[in-house]
Amino acid sequence: MRLDKFLKTNRIIKRRTVAQEVAKAGLVKKDGRILKPSYEVKPGDILEVSYGRRTLKILVTDDMKYQILEERFRGDEDEESN
């Protein structure tokens, strides 16, 4: 399944056009490499998706759903150091 469709179908991002824009902006990575919207997502892939203030690290499951491995919010690091 294409990356943009995967993000939309699993409601990680609400609209496919927004998912395409996020990918084109370099905000979706696998193993530190930026992915294109046309990347074919496979079970076992670990993706890092940055959207808004949120960054998700997700594992793609066998049924093409996902499991959240880590969730961070931009700005949280600043508050913790105070």
Question: What are the residue ranges of the model-derived segments?
Answer:
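Strongly charged
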Residues: 2-5, 17-82
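Loop/turn elements at beta-strand to alpha-helix junctions within RNA-recognition modules
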Residues: 12-13
